[in-house]
C-alpha cells in the first residue's frame, strides 16, 4: 500500500471513529457526517493535483498563528525557535493573509490544519478567519487557560474548530512545567466543553520522565471521564544538549509503540495519534510536505515546527510553491536516500544536514 492510500484510509478511520463518538449529540453527529464527505472530496482533490500537476499535496498542515502566550512553560520549543517571543512588533500575517492560505489549502485538498503558537486563543481574529473555511478541520492546540463562556460558545458555533488542551500528565507534572494552577484551570475548561457536549482532545508532550504516567490506564480513564475523546502524544524534541536526556531513545520508542497499541484496544471510544511514533508505520518522516509541513507566524514555510528552516513564504509565494519548495524537495530526497527513521524526530537528528541543505552546501 502506498503512502497516499495509507494516509487516506487512516483519515477515514479517524472520521469514522469520531462519528461513533458523537452519535449521542445530533448537532455534532451531523457535522461529522458532513466532514466525512468533505474528507472524501479533499482526497479526490489531492489525487487530481497529483495526476494533473504532479504536485503531491499533504493532507495535514500545521500553522503557528500566534506569537504571544500567557504562560512560560519550561522547555517551550516555540519560544526557543522564536515563534513565540511576546514581541508586539514581530512580523505576523494578517487575518486576510491567513484566510487566503486556509482557502488555498482547502482548494488543494488539505483536510486538517493544526493551529498552534504561542497561544492561538490570543488571536481571536485569526481563529475567526479559520472558522470560515468549513472544508478544513482545525485542531486548536491551546493551554486551556483562556477557555471560558465566550470561547465555549465559539467552539459550539464552529464545530470545525476542535480544542486540544495541552497537559504534561496529572497535577504535579503539568504544574511543574506549565505553572501553578494550570492543571486545575485546564480541567475546568474540559468540564465546560463536556457540559456543552463538544468534541475535544488533549495534547501531551511525552518524555523519558512522564511517558508511563500519561499512557497509564488510570490517567486515560481520568481523561475519558472528563469527556476527552482525542489524545495527541508528541515526543519531546530537545532544544539543546541539556535536555537531550528527556528525548526518547530506541527502547522508549519501542515501548511507547506497544503501549499505545494496547490503549487503542482498551479505549475504543478514544482516538490516539502518536507523533512522530506513528510515522514509523508510514516508512519515515512525514515532514517537508510528505504528509505535512509548517507555516510560521510570518508565513515562512518550514519542514516542521521542530525544524525552523525556510526558503519559501506561503503568503508571498502561495501554498503550491511552498509545497514544491527546493528545501522540501531536498529533504524528501535525502530521507529517501538513507535518513533512517528510528522512531524519534528525524529532522532533529539530522538538523545539521537540514541547515546545510538550506545553505546549498550539499
Task: Please tell me what each predicted stretch does.
Residues 69, 73-76, 285, 299, ...:
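Short cysteine clusters
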Residues 123-125, 129-137, 200-210, 239-272:
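Short acidic, glycine/proline-enriched helix-loop-strand junctions
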Residues 83-88, 171-177, 239-244:
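A short acidic, helix-capping loop that chelates divalent metal ions and anchors anionic groups
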Residues 95-115, 121-234:
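Radical SAM/AdoMet-radical enzyme domain recognition
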Amino acid at each position: 500500500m502506498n503512502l497516499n492510500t495509507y494516509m487516506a484510509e487512516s483519515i477515514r478511520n479517524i472520521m469514522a471513529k469520531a462519528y461513533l463518538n458523537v452519535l449521542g449529540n445530533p448537532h455534532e453527529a451531523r457535522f461529522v457526517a458532513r466532514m466525512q464527505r468533505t474528507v472524501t472530496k479533499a482526497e479526490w482533490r489531492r489525487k487530481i493535483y497529483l495526476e494533473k500537476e504532479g504536485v503531491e499535496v499533504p493532507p495535514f498542515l500545521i500553522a503557528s498563528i500566534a506569537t504571544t502566550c500567557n504562560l512560560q512553560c519550561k522547555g517551550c520549543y516555540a519560544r526557543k525557535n522564536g515563534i513565540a517571543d511576546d514581541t508586539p512588533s514581530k512580523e505576523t500575517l494578517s487575518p486576510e493573509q491567513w484566510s487566503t492560505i486556509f482557502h488555498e489549502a482547502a482548494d488543494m485538498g488539505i483536510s486538517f490544519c493544526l493551529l498552534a503558537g504561542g497561544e492561538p486563543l490570543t488571536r481571536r481574529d485569526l481563529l475567526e478567519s479559520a472558522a470560515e473555511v468549513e472544508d478544513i478541520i482545525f485542531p486548536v492546540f491551546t493551554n486551556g487557560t483562556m477557555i471560558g463562556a465566550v470561547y465555549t460558545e465559539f467552539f459550539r458555533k464552529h464545530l470545525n474548530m476542535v480544542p486540544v488542551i495541552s497537559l504534561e500528565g496529572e497535577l504535579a507534572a503539568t504544574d511543574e512545567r506549565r505553572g501553578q494552577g494550570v492543571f486545575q484551570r485546564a480541567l475546568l475548561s474540559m468540564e465546560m466543553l463536556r457540559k456543552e457536549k463538544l468534541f475535544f482532545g488533549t495534547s501531551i508532550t511525552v518524555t523519558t520522565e512522564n511517558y508511563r504516567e500519561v499512557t497509564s490506564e488510570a490517567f486515560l480513564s481520568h481523561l475519558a471521564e472528563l469527556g476527552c475523546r482525542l489524545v495527541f502524544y508528541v515526543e519531546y524534541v530537545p532544544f539543546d544538549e541539556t535536555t537531550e536526556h528527556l528525548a526518547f531513545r530506541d527502547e522508549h520508542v519501542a515501548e511507547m509503540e506497544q503501549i499505545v497499541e494496547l490503549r487503542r484496544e482498551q479505549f475504543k471510544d478514544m482516538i490516539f495519534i502518536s507523533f512522530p511514533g506513528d510515522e514509523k508505520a508510514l516508512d519515515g518522516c512525514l515532514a517537508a510536505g510528505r504528509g505535512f509541513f509548517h507555516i510560521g507566524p510570518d508565513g515562512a514555510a518550514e519542514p516542521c515546527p521542530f525544524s525552523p528552516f525556510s526558503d519559501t513564504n506561503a503568503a508571498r509565494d502561495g501554498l503550491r510553491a511552498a509545497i514544491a519548495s527546493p528545501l522540501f524537495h531536498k529533504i524528501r530526497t535525502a530521507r529517501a536516500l538513507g535518513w533512517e527513521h528510528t522512531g524519534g524526530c528525524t529532522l532533529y537528528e539530522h538538523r545539521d544536514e537540514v541547515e546545510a541543505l538550506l545553505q546549498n552546501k550539499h
